[in-house]
Amino acid sequence: MKTSEERLLAPDSLPPDLAPAPVPQGSPAEKNTDFEPVPPPCGGDDQPQLATDPVASLVVSQELQQGDSVPLEVEFNTSSELSPGIEEQDVSEHASLPGEETNLPELESGEATEGVSEERAEVDEGDTFWTYSFSQVPRYLSGSWSEFSTRSENFLKGCKWAPDGSCILTNSADNVLRIYNLPPELYSEQEQVDYAEMVPVLRMVEGDTIYDYCWYSLMSSTQPDTSYVASSSRENPIHIWDAFTGELRASFRAYNHLDELTAAHSLCFSPDGSQLFCGFNRTVRVFSTSRPGRDCEVRATFAKKQGQSGIISCIAFSPSQPLYACGSYGRTIGLYAWDDGSPLALLGGHQGGITHLCFHPDGNLFFSGARKDAELLCWDLRQPGHLLWSLSREVTTNQRIYFDLDPSGQFLVSGNTSGVVSVWDISGALSDDSKLEPVVTFLPQKDCTNGVSLHPTLPLLATASGQRVFPEPTNSGDEGELELELPLLSLCHAHPECQLQLWWCGGGPDPSSPVDDQDEKGQRRTEAVGMS
C-alpha cells in the first residue's frame, strides 16, 4: 500500500515533460505538475487470498414471461429520511454497511446553522485533473491472462472499477470474483518500459454460477468498513464479501411462497448505501444493509396482467432523481420511485432481454442494452415515451455485453461479440435524425469483449474478454464406420482469448513506439479497425 506522499505518474509512453493533462484551474504559467494521488489498494496483503462459500441451499426455477409494454404515469414522493448504513461483523447476519458521512458539525434540536457552509471547498488552482481523450487509439498498459487459462472453458464475464478507483473487480465462468490493485508501475517516479502481468490480491469463490455482482456504493479504500462487494449466485443467498480480506461478512436471503431459497438475478446498492435492491422474477426485493437476513420489502413489478414481467436482470439508480430503472428479460424497462417502488413508466423497444442499464451523470438521460440486439438505446426521463437516438453495436449471443460512460458523460464505450471496442462522443447527440458514429474503434483481442469499465478519476479503460465456446460438429465419415469410434463434437476451431486488460486513454500525443505483437508475457499490439 502506497503512502499519500507518492504521486501517480503517466504511463511510460508519456514522459513527465510530455505528460498530457487537462487545462488546470490556473493559468498556464501557474500550472503545477503534481498529479492526483491514487487511492490506496483494497487488498491488505500482497499474496492472493482465497475465500470459499459454505452456503448451499435449495433452488427455485423461474420461468421467463413477457408482458405488455404500457406507459404508466404515477407521481412519487422523495424519500424523506435515509436509513443508516453495514458495520463490519462476522457472518452472523447482523452486519451493516456505514452510511455516508458528512463534515458538518452535529447540532442540537432547534440549534441554528449559522456559519455552517455546505458548499464544496474550492479546488486548488495548482491541481491537475486527468480527463479522457480518444483522439487516438488507447495504449495498452497491462493485463491478466494466466489467471484465467487454467481451465479451457473459463472466460471473463465483466469487470468493474471500485467507486474510489483503487482496484478493479472481475467475474469469470469459474465462479470466482477477483480483485486487482492498480499496477504498481503507476506509482513509480521512473519511466516504465514494461508493465508486469497483473495478479489478483483476493479471490472470492462462489458455490455456483454468479448471476451478478457489485461494489458497495460508498466504498472507499481509506475506510475498510466500507470496502464490500455483493454477489449473487445460483442456489445461494446474496453474499457480502470483505474487499480487504476476502472473508464472507453477511448474507441476505430471499424465499418464495414455498419458503424455498431463491437466488437474485441482479444487484444494486442505493446511492446512500442504506439499501440493497435485488431483482427476481417479476419482483424486486429491498434489503436494509443494516439488517442482514431474510427480512426485506417485496415490490412486485407485475400484477393483474399489468406491469413489467420477466426476470429483473439489471437495476440502476438515477444520480439526480429519486428513482431507479429495472431492465427485464421480458424486453422492457421500468421506472420506479425509490421510496415506495410505485411505477412511473414502462418502456419497450429492444429486440431481446435487457442486460445492462446506465444513467448519464446529469440524471436526465439513461442508456439500455440487450442480448441479441444490435442497438444501444438512449432515453430521456423528461420524455420517457420517446426514444432519443440509438447506437449500433454487434451483439449476436445471449451474453451480457457491458457498456460504460466516463465521469463527465461525454464518451460512451462498449464492446461487442467480435471483440471490437467502440467509443462514441455523445456530448452533441441531441437529435434522432442523424446516426451517431464512433470516434474510435479498436480490437483488444480476437474474442468477445464483454466488459468495459472507465476509471472514475484517471484515464484508464479496463476491458474483459471471453465467451462460452460451443463444440462444432465434425464430419460423420463413411456410413459403414461404427458410431462409437467417431468424435461427435470438436473444439478444434475454438481459440478463446480470456484476458483482463488496462488501456491508457489520456489526452495529447503518444510519443512512445508501438507495442509489438503479443509476447510471452501476454502484451498485445492494439489493432485499430477504424477511426473517424
UniProtKB/Swiss-Prot annotation:
Gene3D superfamilies registered for this protein in UniProt: YVTN repeat-like/Quinoprotein amine dehydrogenase
One Pfam family matching this protein: WD40
WD repeat boundaries on the chain: 151-190, 206-251, 256-297, 307-348, 349-389, 395-434
Record SMART domains: WD40
Region entry Disordered, spans: 1-53, 80-122, 510-532
Biased composition (Pro residues): 13-25
PTM sites of type Phosphothreonine: T474
Subunit: Component of the telomerase holoenzyme complex composed of one molecule of TERT, one molecule of WRAP53/TCAB1, two molecules of H/ACA ribonucleoprotein complex subunits DKC1, NOP10, NHP2 and GAR1, and a telomerase RNA template component (TERC). The telomerase holoenzyme complex is associated with TEP1, SMG6/EST1A and POT1. Interacts with the chaperonin-containing T-complex (TRiC) complex; which mediates the folding of WRAP53/TCAB1. Interacts with COIL. Interacts with SMN1. Interacts with RNF8. Interacts with histone H2AX.
Family per record: Belongs to the TCAB1 family.
Record protein name field: Telomerase Cajal body protein 1
Source species: Mus musculus
Organism phylogeny: Eukaryota, Metazoa, Chordata, Craniata, Vertebrata
